[in-house]
């Protein structure tokens, strides 16, 4: 089993570190040619969703990644990755991959100074540390989307089919249970 980590921008190295600590092989997906390599699951890291969306299109990766996700490839998306998956972005007509039937509010927690760390219950895993950096949250979710966690009555973690999307950055904490649960769901 091998995980492909989108490595065009953002916190991809941190996800790779966690996978390495768990003994899970991974490859960086930097261009369209990398999408021809073998990988069983995908991580869409945090970063800047607008930049990531543009780079996916400019590098001819967009359609292939969208097709893989629509075809059931397991995906773990964090922060900007959640925005990439969302079908709707509040106050913005931009649609990126659009495979997750939710509406997100971008930068919901403000600028860098609005960033924070907390702990909350993530259904199926338990209480986990959550680091929010200019994070989005899910403002609306389709009834078939499984809400896994809320913070201050805001949806911050969802699952839809094989898509697992988080507002926060588990890769920035030393608790690897979220990545382990994701990897375990693939095998």
Regions found by a protein language model. Give the residues of each.
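Hydrophobic anchor at the start of a short beta-strand
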Residues: 26-27, 75, 163
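Amide-donor transfer/coupling interface in amidating biosynthetic enzymes
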Residues: 106-187
């Amino acid at each position: 089993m091998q995980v492909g980590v989108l490595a065009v921008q953002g916190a991809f190295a941190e996800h790779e570190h966690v996978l390495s600590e768990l003994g899970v092989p991974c490859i960086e997906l930097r261009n369209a040619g990398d999408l021809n390599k073998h990988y069983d699951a995908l991580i869409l890291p945090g970063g800047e969703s607008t930049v990531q969306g543009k780079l996916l299109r400019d590098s001819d990766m967009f359609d292939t990644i969208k097709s893989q996700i629509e075809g059931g490839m397991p995906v773990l998306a964090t922060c900007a990755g959640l925005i990439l998956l969302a079908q709707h972005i509040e106050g913005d007509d931009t649609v990126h991959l659009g495979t997750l039937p939710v509406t997100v509010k971008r930068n919901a927690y403000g600028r860098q100074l609005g960033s924070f760390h907390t702990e909350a219950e993530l259904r199926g895993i338990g209480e986990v540390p959550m680091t929010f950096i200019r994070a989005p949250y899910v403002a609306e979710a389709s009834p078939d989307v499984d809400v896994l966690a809320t913070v201050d009555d805001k949806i911050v973690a969802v699952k839809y089919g094989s898509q697992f999307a988080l507002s926060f950055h588990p890769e920035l904490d030393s608790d690897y249970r979220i990545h382990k649960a994701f990897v375990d769901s693939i095998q």
